Every structure is written in structure tokens, then in C-alpha cells.
Amino acid sequence: MRKQRQTHGEEVANVLTHGAGMLFGLTAIVVLMIAGIRTGDPWVIGSFAVYALCMTSSYVTSTFYHAASDPKRKCQLRRWDHSAIYLHIAGTYTPFTLVALRDEGFWGWGLFITVWLAAVIGVWFSFRRMKKKDNLKTVCYLLMSWVVIIAFKPLIDVFQRTDSMYVLYWLIGGGLFYSLGTIFFFLDKYKYMHSAWHLFEIGRASCR
């Protein structure tokens, strides 16, 4: 059974971990935009921008949520925090679907639409009043993170043609980081487990 509230010390750790993630995200925006602009490809630039902004928004909302002390404000920010996770996951898929898989028939746009539709539905659910929805949302996060396996074969084909199989390994690593991290999420009745989940989330973002 999950804790309803985190202790002050735990919230400080939560702020520090995702505060570090926020700085990482801001740095990533600069690095990715420079890399994208150098390619001169508008698809690369646009998808990199979407990913960087979605990732950073996730860390920003989480940091503000955990830093809030007023119960009413914290409740409101919690919804934004959970919504941003859906956007973070969808943003992660954007470069793969609109750059790597765009010319692979259904796979690029099909996967892009599927993931972003799931994210929009997830955001909608995050603002609905539902009992015991945290575990359901975590399952949704996991399913979204691993839906890429349906496009595994075309991804491998693209990476082999472009001699960039290492990208696939990083992608798998990100999924493993997030999957292992959910163990700590479900164990957050124990102190500082939520902060540990944050670290795995940052590890996932570093891979992808």
C-alpha cells in the first residue's frame, strides 16, 4: 500500500533529484537544438525540440510539485506532474517516429499518432477524479514506454542501413531504466524510494 504523504526529508530529496533533472533538461535543449540545426533537416530540428521541451516540462512540473507545501496547490501540481510524464514519453518517441521511421510506411506516422493519442488520453485522465488511479497510470506509462517493440523490426532495419545500431541499444537501455524504476515507485511506502525512482527516470532520459 502506498503512502499518502512524503516526509519533509523525502520531499527535499525529490526536489533535488528532479531539480537536477530539470538542469539536465535545460542543457539538453541547447545541445539538441544545436545538433538539430547542424543537420539542416526541419524534421530533426522539430522532433528534437518537441522531445527536449517535453522532457524538461516533466522535470519542471515534478520539481514544483514536490516543493509545494500548500495542500491545495500540491494537489493541483500533482495533476500537472502526472500529465507531464505522458508528454515526456510521447516526446521521447517523436524523433524515432518522425525521423527514423517516417519513410517506413505505416510505422512512423502510425506509431506517432498512437503514442500521442495515448498521451492526450492520459493527460485527460490525470485531471479526472478517480479512486486508486496511481497504479493504473503507472501501468499506462509502462505500456507506452514499451509500445516501441511493435516497430522493432523496422527500427532495426533503419539502424542497420544507417550503421547506427548503437541507438537501438540506448533505446532499450532507457526502457529498462524506466521499468526497473517502477519497482521503486511501487515501493514508495518505504522512505526515499520515490527519489530512487526519480534517479531511474533521469537514467532513462539520459539513454534516450
Label the model's feature ranges.
Residues 1-208:
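Multi-pass alpha-helical transmembrane bundles in non-GPCR membrane proteins
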